[in-house]
């Protein structure tokens, strides 16, 4: 339980007035619980979307659901997406890319990435053929994001500084990663049947390609690229689901 509380404190803005000594918790093994942080985020997203959809049109409810995640996480991973875009697409050397990612200012690539991300995300939600599924998508997709993050932990080489937040998860063993994937697949299968499981295959393929691209650019992962990977992973999952619903 203490591990889950620490993960909630780490990945969300939920005010839990509980002091936990990180030295007493093995976050590498406890990272298997990371998808349950996604469950909490997803439940909040679902609640806000559902409440707003009762009194407002669907597009407004979708925007509210997207904004709900920013509220509960503090935009933690959206900021990581912007930093990753600024760094990786800066056409600079590795060391300079890492410096750009640390810069608190958002550059042109970061702004473009965030705008495209939310526009594409919103368009995909509006493209879901069965609007009754949208609420469940808001619930499940954050779980998928944490599953992608867990995949990126596998045999991770850390490119950032040793003091970076992502370095905490350096050396995560295989079994928490496998458990996390099982949790994600169960969630997708429970809500979206076999189509959800097939969609996650597309997410895994994206994760492999994304990981290879990042390693080629900066030689490993850091906190920003890990967070960005999770955000893009849930977007890719929604894309695959909409695509499969249109084909099947």
Curated annotation (Swiss-Prot):
Pathway: Cofactor biosynthesis; adenosylcobalamin biosynthesis; adenosylcobalamin from cob(II)yrinate a,c-diamide: step 7/7. The keyword Cell membrane applies. It catalyses: alpha-ribazole + adenosylcob(III)inamide-GDP = adenosylcob(III)alamin + GMP + H(+); alpha-ribazole 5'-phosphate + adenosylcob(III)inamide-GDP = adenosylcob(III)alamin 5'-phosphate + GMP + H(+). GO terms for molecular function: adenosylcobinamide-GDP ribazoletransferase activity; cobalamin 5'-phosphate synthase activity. Disulfide bonds: none annotated. The chain crosses the membrane at residues 24-44, 70-90, 106-126, 134-154, 168-188, 189-209, 228-248. It is found in: Cell membrane. Keywords: Cell membrane, Cobalamin biosynthesis, Magnesium, Membrane, Transferase, Transmembrane, Transmembrane helix. Its EC number is 2.7.8.26. GO terms for cellular component: plasma membrane. Its cofactor is Mg(2+). InterPro entries: CobS. It is a multi-pass membrane protein. It comes from the Bacteria. GO terms for biological process: cobalamin biosynthetic process. HAMAP family: CobS. Joins adenosylcobinamide-GDP and alpha-ribazole to generate adenosylcobalamin (Ado-cobalamin). Also synthesizes adenosylcobalamin 5'-phosphate from adenosylcobinamide-GDP and alpha-ribazole 5'-phosphate. Belongs to the CobS family. This is Adenosylcobinamide-GDP ribazoletransferase. It comes from Listeria monocytogenes serotype 4a (strain HCC23). The gene is cobS.
């Amino acid at each position: 339980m203490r591990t889950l509380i620490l993960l909630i404190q780490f990945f969300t803005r939920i005010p839990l007035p509980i002091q936990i000594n990180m030295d007493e918790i093995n976050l590498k093994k406890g990272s298997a619980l990371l998808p349950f942080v996604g469950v909490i985020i997803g439940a909040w997203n679902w609640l806000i979307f559902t409440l707003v959809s009762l009194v407002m049109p669907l597009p407004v409810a979708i925007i509210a659901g997207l904004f709900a995640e920013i509220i509960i996480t503090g935009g933690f991973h959206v900021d990581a997406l912007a930093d990753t875009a600024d760094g990786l697409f800066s056409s600079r050397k590795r060391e300079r890319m890492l410096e750009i990612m640390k810069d608190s200012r958002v550059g042109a690539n970061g702004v473009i990435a965030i705008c495209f991300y939310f526009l594409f995300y919103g368009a995909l939600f509006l493209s879901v053929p069965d609007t009754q599924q949208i609420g469940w998508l808001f619930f499940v997709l954050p779980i998928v994001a944490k599953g992608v993050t867990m995949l990126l932990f596998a045999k991770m080489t850390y490119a950032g500084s040793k003091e970076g937040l992502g370095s905490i998860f350096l050396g995560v063993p295989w079994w928490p990663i496998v458990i996390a994937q099982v949790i994600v697949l169960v969630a997708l299968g429970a809500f979206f049947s076999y189509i959800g499981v097939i969609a996650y295959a597309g997410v895994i393929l994206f994760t492999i390609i994304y990981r290879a691209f990042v390693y080629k650019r900066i030689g490993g992962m850091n906190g920003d690229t890990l967070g960005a990977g999770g955000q893009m992973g849930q977007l890719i999952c929604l894309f695959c689901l909409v695509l499969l619903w249109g084909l099947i």
